[in-house]
Amino acid sequence: MKTLCIFLVLVVAVAAFPPFISQHDCPPNKEFGSYGDCPPSCLKNPPNFCTLKLNYGCKCKEGYVLTRYQDYESDCIKPEECPDDS
């Protein structure tokens, strides 16, 4: 029983902390940091409501936007490079 309790505490501790990614692990035009639930993207009409949820990971650098709305794995490009049909 003691072993099970220790195991559960370790699982909760690991799950409670965001993954530690260094800046060099982020793709081009991205950097590690915190970002909100509605980061800038190529979407022309983003929603008016966003939660205050804070995410940690690779985010677009200043001056770049996600190619796909709320797809945090998508590439970051300059806004003027967004396709016209976004």
Curated annotation (Swiss-Prot):
Tissue-wise expression: Only expressed in fat body.
Molecular function, one GO term: serine-type endopeptidase inhibitor activity
SUPFAM superfamilies reported in the protein's UniProt record: Serine protease inhibitors
Gene Ontology cellular component list: extracellular space
CDD domains to which the protein is assigned, alphabetical: TIL
Record-annotated disulphide pairs: 26-58, 38-50, 42-82, 60-76
Leader sequence residues: 1-16
A Pfam entry, by short name: TIL
Annotated InterPro entries: Ser_inhib-like_sf, TIL_dom
Principal cellular location given in the protein's record: secreted
Keyword entries, A-Z: Disulfide bond, Protease inhibitor, Secreted, Serine protease inhibitor, Signal
Residues covered by the TIL domain: 26-82
Compartments (UniProt record): Secreted
Physiological role: Serine protease inhibitor that inhibits chymotrypsin (IC(50)=34.13 nM, Ki=49.85 nM), microbial serine proteases (subtilisin A (IC(50)=21.31 nM, Ki=20.51 nM) and proteinase K (IC(50)=52.56 nM, Ki=65.42 nM)), as well as human neutrophil elastase (IC(50)=11.54 nM, Ki=8.74 nM), and porcine pancreatic elastase (IC(50)=19.07 nM, Ki=11.32 nM).
Note: Negative results: does not inhibit trypsin, plasmin, tPA, thrombin and factor Xa. Is not expressed in epidermis, silk gland and venom gland.
Family of the protein in this entry: Belongs to the serine protease inhibitor-like (TIL domain-containing) family.
Protein name: Chymotrypsin inhibitor
Organism (species): Araneus ventricosus
